[in-house]
A protein has these predicted regions:
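A short, conserved structural fragment
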Residues: 55-65
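Surface-exposed polar/charged interaction patches
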Residues: 21-25, 57, 87
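Short, amphipathic alpha-helical interaction segments positioned at domain boundaries
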Residues: 72-91
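Short amphipathic alpha-helical interaction segments
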Residues: 40-57
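Minor-groove-contacting beta-hairpin "wing" of winged helix-turn-helix DNA-binding domains
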Residues: 66-71
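Short amphipathic alpha-helical interface segments
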Residues: 2-45
Length: 91
């Protein structure tokens, strides 16, 4: 596996983990509230290169103590979200 393939795989894993953790933390699925997921919960270091790439792709934003999934992804299904990430990585 090349370095680029490893990075791509890691990026997808982090994106999906962020998506799942966000869904679990939301108290009300119809709520517009997007929780902050800590670096520890996401299991990444501050300013991890994959996280910065996801930020550049518009998937997340940084907060003082972690990251937040962008609002437009909060109501997507898991399959829709995975497809979005896949398409963005191919661009």
């Amino acid at each position: 596996m090349t370095q680029e393939q490893k990075h791509d795989h890691r990026l997808k894993n982090i994106a999906l983990r962020l998506f799942v953790l966000t869904r679990k933390k939301r108290s009300d699925i119809t709520s517009r509230y997007i929780p902050t997921i800590s670096w520890h919960e996401l299991n990444v270091q501050f300013q991890d290169i994959a996280v910065m790439d996801l930020r550049q792709m518009g998937v997340l934003r940084l907060s003082g103590d972690g990251v937040m999934l962008e609002q437009r992804f909060a109501d997507m299904s898991t399959n829709e979200f995975q497809e979005y990430i896949k398409e963005r990585r191919q661009q």
